[in-house]
Amino acid sequence: MAAGVAAWLPFARAAAIGWMPVASGPMPAPPRQERKRTQDALIVLNVSGTRFQTWQDTLERYPDTLLGSSERDFFYHPETQQYFFDRDPDIFRHILNFYRTGKLHYPRHECISAYDEELAFFGLIPEIIGDCCYEEYKDRRRENAERLQDDADTDNTCESALPTMTARQRVWRAFENPHTSTMALVFYYVTGFFIAVSVIANVVETVPCGSSPGHIKELPCGERYAVAFFCLDTACVMIFTVEYLLRLAAAPSRYRFVRSVMSIIDVVAILPYYIGLVMTDNEDVSGAFVTLRVFRVFRIFKFSRHSQGLRILGYTLKSCASELGFLLFSLTMAIIIFATVMFYAEKGSSASKFTSIPAAFWYTIVTMTTLGYGDMVPKTIAGKIFGSICSLSGVLVIALPVPVIVSNFSRIYHQNQRADKRRAQKKARLARIRAAKSGSANAYMQSKRNGLLSNQLQSSEEEPAFVSKSGSSFETQHHHLLHCLEKTTNHEFVDEQVFEESCMEVATVNRPSSHSPSLSSQQGVTSTCCSRRHKKTFRIPNANVSGSQRGSVQELSTIQIRCVERTPLSNSRSSLNAKMEECVKLNCEQPYVTTAIISIPTPPVTTPEGDDRPESPEYSGGNIVRVSAL
């Protein structure tokens, strides 16, 4: 059964998303189940422990799906006589109802991604969702795709700069995520400051600043201090122009960037300045220029790059486009209807201001939006009655879409809050990982010195005895692992500091033999689970000892460096103190070296009486592998 399921899965996944399976041969035949079936048998479906029962004919109504075809036999268990699916039982209820009723519905409380995965597994396409749920399903799916794309773009911009990134990619990354570097952060705050200055200057230049000498009429600040405001506007426009050109040059897709809303806002914000530079002193042209200067107020929308709340508001309006369209259409119909009624109701009054139906539009708009300026009021009884109805209908028309807009705003706001929280947690987690990796070698060696390899060496003439300290279960397991490695590989693992101390003792004191103070070599610390090779300990010479004291000892001849992607390689040289250029180049891209010291003893010398005796202190031909780099 397991082999059949494994062979079926790739074809089921391909068929579920509408792709034809690519294979050299046909699909494997489903396993034959030796059981008797009636024409309309009762089938038991076990979905993660939840049992569903239905008729076989109900499932076979749709033979192109998983449950309606013979492919469901791959999931049949003869012992329980059930079809077992390790899927979500809550969503499966809606899928099974589709076989019963022929209508597929989308549960609003379910995750859109999980729902799509279940449909893909059972071989159902989203296009068969009923009309009552299809629009909401498409909206949720589009919003989810946009959110995932935004999260992916944010994650890409928040990642650390790679060495392979080009200058163009670095500039775009600095614009999208100013916190990547100090210069990007400075430019971010400088542009924000000039945006605020530009908006404030656009407002202040219309404030009256008194009359200038030779003029009786009071002039606005923009005309009285024209040079100062021109210089200020020039500085702001220069900053905005440089920002726009840099964004255009660094954009991954310039065509997409030019079509974006923020790009259009940038162009509209700086365009009036350049048009004013080339315009003549003609009064007609100057009047058009004054009208064009109104577009400078769009610079305030540049704050959306600096404000998350404005971006959330934009996403909300975009997601509520259908509701806003319904509101606009309803208001338009109501305005036309009530303006027509009010015109004919007030037509008989001589003091009426409802001179035409378009003139009555203003009264209808002000009344339906519950503003009520009072500049136009009905005079007749019929006009007052219809005006009251217009006011009440306006409250109903405007109030209906508002809860939907508020709900979408709340949902998008909380989604962004959760996304920001996830990114902050990911950033903190990566920081902890980097901190742990940077201090891993020191922490490992410190733990060995404190608990793993910090035992006192108790040597005697007959047999060395070791005293171990009580440690945690992790330390005990680590001791046991080192103990088994020493017995099976005939290697001995010691701390680097203990190794140097032992070497100094060997250089100063000449004793017959000595054992390295390793917890893994202790008798009684761990159980004897590995067959021990015949091993004799020996003196470890110090590399720092002078040449006269070393004798014929060969200095640290070989270092083993393991590659992540390939088999272990060795890099040999006559001395580890030599430069790396003098050695054979490693044939791997990412070598790593562990912090350890391994002593390889030479075979023991057997006396004619059959007893083993330690070798002479010269250690001719002894090899020591010392790896002290991380």
Curated annotation (Swiss-Prot):
Lineage summary: Eukaryota, Metazoa, Chordata, Craniata, Vertebrata
Tissue: Detected in brain frontal cortex.
Protein name: A-type voltage-gated potassium channel KCND2
Residues that, per the record, bind K(+): T370, L371, G372, Y373
An example Gene Ontology CC term for this record: plasma membrane
Region (S4-S5 linker): 308-321
Intramembrane region(s): 358-369, 370-377
Reactions performed catalytically: K(+)(in) = K(+)(out)
Native organism: Oryctolagus cuniculus
Localization per record: Cell membrane; Cell projection, Dendrite; Synapse; Perikaryon
Modified residues (Phosphoserine): S438, S548, S552, S572, S575, S616
